[in-house]
Amino acid sequence: MDSGEVKISLEDSPSSGESFASTTSGPCCGSGRDLDIQVHESHIKDDQFPSRATSELQESKKSNKKCSSDLSTENSYAANKNVAEGLMDIALLSANANQLRFLITYNDKASTYIYSMIMVILSLVLQLLVGIMLIFKRRLKRFRNRSYERTNDLLVMGVFMITVINILLAAFTTTDGGGSH
């Protein structure tokens, strides 16, 4: 059955740094990774070539499906964003702990000592509560019920309160402590 020879090659080979799965998903993307079909016309006439394969390729070019490499780019962005947010949370937590140490050590005679101390402790407690709620939110995400929505609302309010408290804390903290330790 030597009626003709069909060669199918990929523009990007698996050795080009991508995984084999993302390379073979080319027809779904419509992003330049379409299969090149070369037909030796000496062996096959145009009416003998299966039109199903060419019509599938043309339809896949028109579709807007995302490649797995496109999805991994979005997942990578989300992961990097989450890491950056986590690092910012840790920085805020350590800054508040350092401010608490500063208040206790050097600023215990300041006129705003009690207000600053209350706000630092309140901010630290709220940060811990928000962190614990984030853990539970992840577990509740599977169910998407009313408690998930309530937890999400409480988290937004908690983050807002932490922000307001830290702005007020920056305004009320003074360095006019009379104690020299």
Swiss-Prot record:
InterPro entries with a match to the protein in the record: Ninjurin
Pfam short name (any one): Ninjurin
Biased composition (Polar residues): 12-26
Topological domains, Extracellular: 1-115, 175-181
Membrane topology: Multi-pass membrane protein
Keyword DNA damage: no
Superkingdom per UniProt: Eukaryota
Keyword Translocase applies: no
Location relative to the cell: Membrane
Chain intervals with Basic and acidic residues compositional bias: 1-10, 33-49
GO (cellular component) term, any one: membrane
Residues covered by region (Disordered): 1-72
Topological domain spans for side Cytoplasmic: 137-153
Spans through the membrane: 116-136, 154-174
Signal peptide: none
Keyword annotations of the record: Cell adhesion, Cytolysis, Membrane, Transmembrane, Transmembrane helix
Region ranges (Helix alpha2): 94-110
Region annotation (Helix alpha1) ranges: 80-91
One GO biological process term: cytolysis
Domains: entry comment: Composed of 4 alpha helices: 2 hydrophobic transmembrane regions (alpha3 and alpha4) and 2 alpha helices (alpha1 and alpha2). Alpha1 and alpha2 feature one hydrophobic side and a hydrophilic side. In normal conditions, NijB is inactivated and alpha1 and alpha2 helices are not inserted into the membrane. Following NijB activation, alpha1 and alpha2 helices insert into the membrane and drive NijB oligomerization via interactions between alpha3 and alpha4 and the hydrophobic face of alpha1 from an adjacent subunit.
UniProt family annotation: Belongs to the ninjurin family.
Function (record text): Effector of non-apoptotic necrotic cell death that mediates plasma membrane rupture (cytolysis): oligomerizes in response to death stimuli and promotes plasma membrane rupture by introducing hydrophilic faces of 2 alpha helices into the hydrophobic membrane, leading to release intracellular molecules that propagate the inflammatory response. Also acts as a homophilic transmembrane adhesion molecule that promotes cell adhesion by mediating homophilic interactions via its extracellular region.
Protein name (Swiss-Prot/TrEMBL): Ninjurin-B
Species the sequence originates in: Drosophila melanogaster (Fruit fly)
